């Protein structure tokens, strides 16, 4: 795959980039490994100063970085600005909390025959980050901020269609004051990942991306006995019960499905409405989806921009067309507009049966599948009928139902009466084929630490 900026709103190639050579990759690994030897001994106070300075730059340059994101992968300018500001928040969170989150944990010394016993968190070393295009800054920052604050150093292999975002990340972290070579961007294809991950100087890896990419990286890391965090796909359920505030649920359902032009791993994708309110939910949901404006992502009036890649749109088209051919009903959308760029309209599909691929598959675009549940257990059965287990939403005012959803939905996250969102303060990740490990919060910063037992007689 070429490394290039291709404007998804027009399909035009804006700029191409020379890939990082094998010699340059070797040099980057060597420099990262050498840097870790002294960077690990910097203090939390020093790292916090650099992290806060990086946050200042991210805030000050939000308009510029937003323009890069919109140009390279098509998200609306406002959502791109929001992403840049969220990155600043992530750096500030770990600047403030890292020392506390990684403080020594005393154990009961007498119980283990010691005068002193504790668990200590120490950085692992060079961590390879393989990151996707859909949140080109935030996906990387939610690795970089905790990893750097823990004393690790990073090598970034970003998606090949967001090279300018990838280069900006390394640049802004360097300008924030982090020592040279603490965080480096490598412009390489997926084929170059294996050699880096097998290098003994690389201690661990984190990947956000597709299931096949996660399988490949997980297999290599397993062979090398190296820790990994995998955040893969999702086909999140959004359940609406009779006691829900229906208008609020519908409004959130629309936002949850079309955020980031429908290209979010934690977007609500499968909407499950109780039979008592199913018809009303579908009517209101379709009506709101039909009002959304598809267009130029730089236009402030645009609700939904283009999909990021031509192949991505082709995949969405194939999934929708296959469902329709099998008997599913397209309530709105379903046909690409006749215009340049990789646009696809907000689409709602009903009457999906278990034998259709759409019943379990993830659709990475603004396409909503709607199902009717006869009761709460039926809703949970539909929700869990997927190989994925990333996020989930349930809308009900009934506290017993809320507890039932929390206990029985098989996912890494359950949001009640709200939209699934990643926060620096909360652990983020999934189970089943959505991956393993956690990003963000206490759990995220400890993923790439050696938990060292200390025992003193």
Swiss-Prot record:
Transmembrane helix: present as a keyword of the record? no
Q: What is its EC number?
A: 1.2.1.79
Tell me its family. Belongs to the aldehyde dehydrogenase family.
User: Which lineage do the record's taxonomy fields give for this organism?
Assistant: Bacteria, Bacillati, Actinomycetota, Actinomycetes, Mycobacteriales
Residues annotated to bind NADP(+): 133-134, 157-160, 209-210, 232, 362
**Which is a GO BP term held by this UniProt record?**
tricarboxylic acid cycle
Xref: PANTHER family: SUCCINATE SEMIALDEHYDE DEHYDROGENASE [NAD(P)+] SAD (PTHR43217:SF1)
Q: Which InterPro entries match?
A: Ald_DH/histidinol_DH (IPR016161), Ald_DH_C (IPR016163), Ald_DH_CS_CYS (IPR016160), Ald_DH_N (IPR016162), Aldehyde_DH_dom (IPR015590), ALDH_GabD1-like (IPR044148), GABD/Sad-like (IPR047110)
Keywords, A to Z, come to: NADP, Oxidoreductase, Tricarboxylic acid cycle
Q: Which GO terms describe its molecular function?
A: aldehyde dehydrogenase [NAD(P)+] activity; succinate-semialdehyde dehydrogenase (NAD+) activity; succinate-semialdehyde dehydrogenase (NADP+) activity
Q: What class of enzyme is it?
A: oxidoreductase
This protein's species is Mycobacterium leprae (strain TN)
Briefly state the protein's biological role: Catalyzes the NADP(+)-dependent oxidation of succinate semialdehyde to succinate. It is believed to be the main source of succinate semialdehyde dehydrogenase activity in Mycobacterium.
The primary gene name is: gabD1
Kindly identify the residues recorded as the active site: 231, 265
User: What is catalyzed by this enzyme?
Assistant: succinate semialdehyde + NADP(+) + H2O = succinate + NADPH + 2 H(+)
What is the protein named? Succinate-semialdehyde dehydrogenase [NADP(+)]
